[in-house]
């Protein structure tokens, strides 16, 4: 059993006590699916940490975006300084997958920019799982994508011990086999250098180098060294060097795979010829032969992942190995944070990936086996994660139906109440809100404003700047590292308020915010539904003066339901405060960078969206109706994933086409 040692100046209080006990007890009784309904500011992260210490299993915490994953990673590093807390997200700063657009006969080559720091953290995560069981990995949905086989990875590990009989050339060959490159000049991660009878290697997953000193054919000394100065940090008796990459394949496997790939290519070529598709037949033959030549000469080729089924010896349709396979015995605890957003995201990955690759296969750009280079589908994911804790302030019916037990965490240890919710008419809403903002500025508090359209956000920001407010507008063209810096500057007082379309950002901790203003709150739709309203109102729940103003001319069902739920939570907290003699206090929290700068964030999403927008043109779709339908499909897809800012961009593009009945 994993031994986790939690360090915190706080003790469980309020609903945390019962929630922790009930969740741990339920898992102990053999229940596998549990939901924690925890309001904003109730200390859900603390509860998660306590549950981990009691369940005593390696843990995977799944978050729906890199920003929140990074925030959780930092918090769990503080909770568990003596345990292995790791970070596993996509290592692409920018990623454009290969694709084919039949309507314009356009083939888009794969283009990407890889983040070396995140690659190192990913490798460190898997090496920790293979070395120890007291491991907590905070991950994005990247954990369901294909990764090298853990068996191949483990079988390729190089273990060295002082006194071992092994010659220098043997060690060099072993390092080359596990994807390290010899470079006697550049001693950086993934490289090794040789100086006489001394070999120094820079593992891809750690900060220190390793020095191997030989005396003839015997290892005379092992030590960790500073890669810059070469100074010895600590002497070692033994070292374990893990591969530089997750995908490791032996020579015999590559030869076997090449035979199978050629057989599949011949069958696919014959299929195309029978269909009268001579261009596709020629294309698949030439592209595959080129890749095979590259693979034979260099050991790799562009898009090698598309041949992963053959290279790993999997059967047709068999799922790929992924991070979940690296957990020992596949016996671990899964915590899905903000489950109402994360679960739909997991479910959508497989379908989106398959749709793109199916087109590549149909037009001869890829073999059918490329379809097996994919993320897990939802059924496979569920089968691999039996012990699951869903965590959300607004869980979806999906996770509630699956759960064998549901526990609430309504009471906040700080005594803070849910924000007061007030509905005001939209008439003169801009001036009314300006007065409210000035009141908050006088109290050194901050404000969040959410609008329905990009144009309204821009106009509102310009107007408030003219009247002297320190205001920032968060929009999709701001990369996420800059976005997190704007949020930090809001906390520091550089800005008085922030305007945006989607300021949900579940889990973001901004205790200085005492007012959330929701403009056009009665425009029922994906930006103003019950869950969106509850989550947005919750942004003011960490401040003792928390208040939400909904500007609306009518009471929608979503507004009524959100106000009713907020009032229910307020009454529960008030009763607890009165019983325990608690005076509510604003959460006091140090101002950190939410995301370390070296951890590049979700630029890839923003860039991908720009590329999508370029794709949706009248020239391509011929008629406004066809373009409108395509835009609507994308809008609804993003809305279903609660990615409202992107959904709103597609909606705005629809509106720009001219009058039509558009559902928001």
Curated annotation (Swiss-Prot):
Keywords: ATP-binding, Cytoplasm, DNA damage, DNA excision, DNA repair, Excision nuclease, Helicase, Hydrolase, Nucleotide-binding, SOS response
Keyword ATP-binding: yes
Domain Helicase C-terminal: 429-595
Listed GO CC annotations: cytoplasm; excinuclease repair complex
Protein name listed in UniProt: UvrABC system protein B
Purpose: The UvrABC repair system catalyzes the recognition and processing of DNA lesions. A damage recognition complex composed of 2 UvrA and 2 UvrB subunits scans DNA for abnormalities. Upon binding of the UvrA(2)B(2) complex to a putative damaged site, the DNA wraps around one UvrB monomer. DNA wrap is dependent on ATP binding by UvrB and probably causes local melting of the DNA helix, facilitating insertion of UvrB beta-hairpin between the DNA strands. Then UvrB probes one DNA strand for the presence of a lesion.
Molecular functions (GO terms): ATP binding; ATP hydrolysis activity; DNA binding; excinuclease ABC activity; helicase activity
Motif (Beta-hairpin): 91-114
Compartments, as annotated in UniProt: Cytoplasm
Protein family membership: Belongs to the UvrB family.
The UVR domain, residue ranges: 625-660
Gene: uvrB
Entry-linked InterPro entries: Helicase/UvrB_N, Helicase_ATP-bd, Helicase_C-like, P-loop_NTPase, UVR_dom, UVR_dom_sf, UvrB, UvrB_inter
GO BP annotation list: nucleotide-excision repair; SOS response
Major localization listed first in the record, in broad terms: cytoplasm
Domain characteristics, as noted in the entry: The beta-hairpin motif is involved in DNA binding.
Binding site for ATP: 38-45
Domain Helicase ATP-binding: 25-182
PANTHER family tied to this protein: UVRABC SYSTEM PROTEIN B
SMART domains hit by this protein: DEXDc (SM00487), HELICc (SM00490)
Subunit structure as annotated in this protein's UniProt entry: Forms a heterotetramer with UvrA during the search for lesions. Interacts with UvrC in an incision complex.
Pfam families (UniProt xref): Helicase_C (PF00271), ResIII (PF04851), UVR (PF02151), UvrB (PF12344), UvrB_inter (PF17757)
């Amino acid at each position: 059993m994993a031994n986790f040692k939690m360090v915190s100046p706080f003790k469980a209080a309020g609903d945390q006590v019962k929630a922790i006990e009930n969740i741990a007890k339920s898992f102990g009784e053999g229940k596998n699916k549990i939901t924690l309904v925890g309001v904003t500011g109730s200390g859900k992260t603390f509860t998660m940490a306590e549950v981990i210490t009691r369940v005593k299993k390696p843990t995977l915490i799944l978050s729906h975006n890199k920003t929140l994953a990074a925030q959780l990673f930092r918090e769990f590093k503080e909770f568990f300084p003596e345990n292995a807390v790791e970070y596993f997200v996509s290592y692409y700063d920018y990623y454009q997958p290969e694709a084919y657009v039949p309507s314009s006969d356009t083939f888009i080559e794969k283009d990407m920019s890889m983040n070396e720091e995140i690659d190192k953290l990913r490798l460190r995560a898997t090496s920790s799982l293979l070395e120890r069981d007291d491991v907590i990995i905070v991950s994005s949905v990247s954990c369901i994508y294909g990764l090298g086989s853990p068996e191949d990875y483990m079988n390729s590990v190089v273990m060295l011990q002082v006194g071992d009989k092994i010659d220098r050339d043997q060690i060099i060959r072993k390092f080359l086999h596990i994807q390290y490159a010899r470079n006697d000049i550049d001693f950086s991660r993934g490289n090794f250098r040789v100086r006489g009878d001394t070999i120094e290697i820079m593992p891809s997953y750690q900060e220190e180098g390793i020095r191997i000193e030989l005396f003839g054919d015997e290892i005379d000394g092992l030590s960790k060294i500073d890669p810059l100065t070469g100074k010895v940090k600590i002497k070692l008796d033994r070292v374990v060097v893990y591969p530089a990459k997750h995908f490791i394949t032996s020579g015999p496997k590559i030869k076997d795979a090449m035979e199978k790939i050629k057989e599949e290519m011949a069958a696919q070529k014959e299929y195309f010829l029978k269909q009268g598709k001579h261009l596709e037949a020629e294309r698949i033959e030439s592209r595959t032969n080129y890749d095979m030549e590259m693979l034979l000469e260099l050991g790799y080729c562009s898009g090698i992942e598309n041949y992963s089924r053959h290279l790993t010896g999997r059967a047709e349709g068999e799922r790929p190995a992924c991070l979940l396979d690296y957990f020992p015995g596949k016996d671990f605890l899964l915590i899905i944070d903000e489950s109402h957003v994360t679960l739909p995201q997991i479910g959508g990955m497989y379908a989106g990936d398959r749709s793109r690759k199916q087109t590549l296969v149909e037009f001869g750009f890829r073999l059918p086996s490329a379809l097996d280079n994919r993320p897990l589908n939802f059924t496979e994911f569920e089968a691999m994660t039996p012990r699951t804790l869903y965590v959300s302030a607004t869980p979806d019916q999906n996770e509630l139906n699956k759960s064998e037990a549901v526990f609430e965490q309504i009471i906040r240890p700080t005594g803070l109440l849910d924000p007061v919710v007030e509905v005001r008419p939209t008439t003169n809403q801009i001036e009314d809100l300006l007065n409210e903002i000035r009141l908050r500025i006088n109290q050194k508090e901050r404000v969040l404003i959410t609008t329905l359209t990009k144009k309204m956000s821009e106009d509102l920001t310009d107007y408030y700047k003219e009247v002297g407010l320190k205001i920032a507008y968060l929009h999709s063209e701001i990369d996420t590292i800059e976005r997190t810096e704007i949020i930090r500057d809001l906390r520091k007082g550089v800005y008085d308020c922030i305007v945006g379309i989607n300021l949900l950002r579940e889990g973001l901790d901004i205790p200085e915010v005492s007012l959330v203003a929701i403009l056009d709150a009665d425009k029922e739709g994906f930006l103003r539904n019950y869950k969106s309203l509850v989550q947005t109102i919750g942004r003011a729940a960490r401040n003792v003066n928390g208040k939400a103003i909904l500007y609306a001319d009518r009471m929608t069902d979503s507004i009524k339901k959100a106000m009713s739920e907020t009032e229910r939570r307020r009454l529960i907290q008030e009763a607890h405060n009165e019983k325990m003699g608690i005076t509510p206090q604003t959460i006091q929290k140090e101002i950190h960078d939410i995301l370390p700068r070296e951890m590049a964030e979700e630029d890839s999403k923003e860039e991908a969206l720009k590329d999508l927008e370029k794709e949706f043109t009248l020239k391509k779709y011929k008629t406004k109706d066809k373009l409108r339908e395509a835009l609507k499909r994308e809008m609804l897809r993003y809305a279903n994933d609660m990615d409202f800012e992107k959904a709103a961009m597609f909606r705005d593009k629809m509106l720009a086409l001219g009058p039509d009945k558009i559902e928001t």
